[in-house]
Amino acid sequence: MWKLWKFVDFRMTAVGFHIFFALIAFAVHFACISSERFNWLEGAPAAEYYMDENPGIWKRTSYDG
């Protein structure tokens, strides 16, 4: 493996990998924003369907004490 780094610059390879993964992350996030189900900027219509009539009140589920 050490012979590989004689031909390839490690710093440029590391920078290239970071840029590549950042582009993949941006693509995934933009794909989520463009879909109706996973768009967190425009509100969540699926979450509004499941909301309780009093969403600000915490309910105890383990005990009634």
Swiss-Prot record:
Known partners and oligomeric status: The core complex is formed by different alpha and beta chains, binding bacteriochlorophyll molecules, and arranged most probably in tetrameric structures disposed around the reaction center. The non-pigmented gamma chains may constitute additional components.
GO-annotated molecular function: bacteriochlorophyll binding; electron transporter, transferring electrons within the cyclic electron transport pathway of photosynthesis activity; metal ion binding
Listed Pfam families: LHC (PF00556)
GO BP annotation list: photosynthesis, light reaction
NCBIfam families linked to this entry: pufA_517_ASD
Subcellular location: Cell inner membrane
Protein name: Light-harvesting protein B800/830/1020 alpha-2 chain
Family: Belongs to the antenna complex alpha subunit family.
Function: Antenna complexes are light-harvesting systems, which transfer the excitation energy to the reaction centers.
Disulphide connectivity of cysteines: none
Primary site of residence: membrane
Taxonomic classification: Bacteria, Pseudomonadati, Pseudomonadota, Gammaproteobacteria, Chromatiales
Membrane topology (Periplasmic): 35-65
Membrane topology recorded in Swiss-Prot or TrEMBL: Single-pass type II membrane protein
InterPro entries given in the database record: Antenna_a/b (IPR000066), Antenna_alpha (IPR018332), Antenna_alpha_CS (IPR002361), Light-harvesting_complex (IPR035889)
Ranges per topology, Cytoplasmic: 1-13
Binding-site residues, a bacteriochlorophyll: 29
Keywords attached to this entry: Antenna complex, Bacteriochlorophyll, Cell inner membrane, Cell membrane, Chlorophyll, Chromophore, Light-harvesting polypeptide, Magnesium, Membrane, Metal-binding, Transmembrane, Transmembrane helix
GO cellular component: organelle inner membrane; plasma membrane; plasma membrane light-harvesting complex
Transmembrane segments: 14-34
